[in-house]
């Protein structure tokens, strides 16, 4: 008996909602939000939300030289300084752009490396 009564109540509620105006429905939503402490905001897609969380929690980065720019010699010098490689190896890294210069670098160090390379004229991305 209780199941039948509950079903009738739900059907009545739905029928009332169908006949309500937009303003009445808006007031209903606000009242429900206040009463139950919830929000009617649409949830963000789970995949996008997970990607945002992964990006926020990332604590190590790969520094990638995407382009040497016009000042190639200056960029080679900075790459040598950062990697400790010789002139030939540093030139090969710069000529082979896009290429990863350093992997698994802490966020602060990655930003520092990026700033040095950009100051020398290179384009850099952190991954």
Swiss-Prot record:
Coiled coil regions in record: none
Family annotation (InterPro entries): Ribosomal_bL12, Ribosomal_bL12_C, Ribosomal_bL12_C/ClpS-like, Ribosomal_bL12_oligo, Ribosomal_bL12_oligo_N_sf
Keywords: Ribonucleoprotein, Ribosomal protein
One GO location term (cellular component): cytosolic large ribosomal subunit
Function: Forms part of the ribosomal stalk which helps the ribosome interact with GTP-bound translation factors. Is thus essential for accurate translation.
Family (UniProt): Belongs to the bacterial ribosomal protein bL12 family.
Subunit structure: Homodimer. Part of the ribosomal stalk of the 50S ribosomal subunit. Forms a multimeric L10(L12)X complex, where L10 forms an elongated spine to which 2 to 4 L12 dimers bind in a sequential fashion. Binds GTP-bound translation factors.
Protein name as catalogued: Large ribosomal subunit protein bL12
Organism: Streptococcus thermophilus (strain ATCC BAA-250 / LMG 18311)
Record lineage: Bacteria, Bacillati, Bacillota, Bacilli, Lactobacillales
């Amino acid at each position: 008996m209780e199941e039948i009564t509950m079903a009738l109540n739900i059907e009545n509620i739905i029928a009332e909602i169908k006949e309500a105006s937009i303003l009445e429905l808006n007031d209903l939503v606000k009242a429900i939000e206040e009463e139950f402490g919830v929000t009617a905001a649409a949830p963000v897609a789970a995949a996008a939300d997970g990607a945002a969380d992964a990006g926020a929690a990332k604590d190590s980065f790969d520094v990638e030289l995407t382009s040497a720019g016009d000042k190639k010699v200056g960029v080679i010098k900075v790459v040598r300084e950062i990697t400790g490689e010789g002139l030939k190896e540093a030139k090969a890294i710069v000529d082979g752009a896009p290429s990863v210069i350093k992997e698994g670098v802490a966020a602060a160090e990655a930003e520092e490396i990026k700033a040095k390379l950009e100051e020398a004229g290179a384009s850099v991305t952190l991954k």
